[in-house]
């Protein structure tokens, strides 16, 4: 059936016309800095801990006017000594004083050797400072989406680490690269494929030195010998880790690196130790199951391992990615297993 037709509706007033939307007046933007505030990405980044900021500030070379004045004074003194020596050699040559000439020649050789040593030490110190700058560059590249800088940077790191062109890890990294990869992806691939090869060597060195410290303290009855042994082995460990990452240490650079490691350990101290080891130690009740000397050996081994981890952090050219940083608890479990095996062997020999 068809629906009935609706009746017609008559409107008493005419329909109102739709009003057009009012257009806003145009607004011209002028180049005025007082209306806009530029965003600073460094300020918007997540703030680091106070300890990390203090460590970074301590590791940066400080420029002081007093230092410049002392350097200028030493330079003038060196120039005066050299000029006086040249004048003395000249007068000795005119007077044919061969003894004075021989002394002058010996002095020239000594000065040349000292200057060469100072230049070598300065070069090594500069290389150690440049490693911190390389980590800053790596952080920038890991946050960058540009193309063209990442590969050259990573190839320079491989050259510094003395990796051969045919190294398997380096070959895998080069085979994984594509022309569409940006700098962030290139550096991330290097950190995942090449850097772990060096980190694995450093971890093995840390495990070996920590185990030696643990066993030495556990079996040695002389505290003074223990302290000397631990100090010597820790210095050797820092030197070994620096060499693995392509850093050649001299006298002053070795002192500076060891100072940086101790500063880093001091600022990172209690919170990191509690978060990684504290609860695990309490749960296992080590003091109830080990002798006093064995517990002291575990503590010395953990100190060596922690120093090695901090040395790795300061010598690596790349910052730690998520999950890459060694944990102190991993070394603790290795030390416990090795110490347990050593004690069991000693018990069997005693029986």
From Swiss-Prot:
> Can you list the GO cellular component terms from the UniProt entry?
plasma membrane
Where is it predominantly found?
A: membrane
Please tell me whether the keyword Metal-binding is annotated for this protein. no
- The secretion signal range is none
Q: Which residues cross the membrane?
A: 69-89, 99-119, 212-232, 241-258
Q: Which Pfam families match?
A: DUF697
Show the NCBIfam families listed in the entry.
hyp_HI0043
Q: Which PANTHER family match?
A: UPF0283 MEMBRANE PROTEIN YCJF
Task: Give yes or no: UniProt keyword Cytoplasm.
Answer: no
List the protein's name: UPF0283 membrane protein ETA_16440
Which UniProt keyword terms apply here?
Cell inner membrane, Cell membrane, Membrane, Transmembrane, Transmembrane helix
Q: Where in the cell is it found?
A: Cell inner membrane
Q: How does it sit in the membrane?
A: Multi-pass membrane protein
* Similarity-based family: Belongs to the UPF0283 family.
**Lineage of producing organism:** Bacteria, Pseudomonadati, Pseudomonadota, Gammaproteobacteria, Enterobacterales
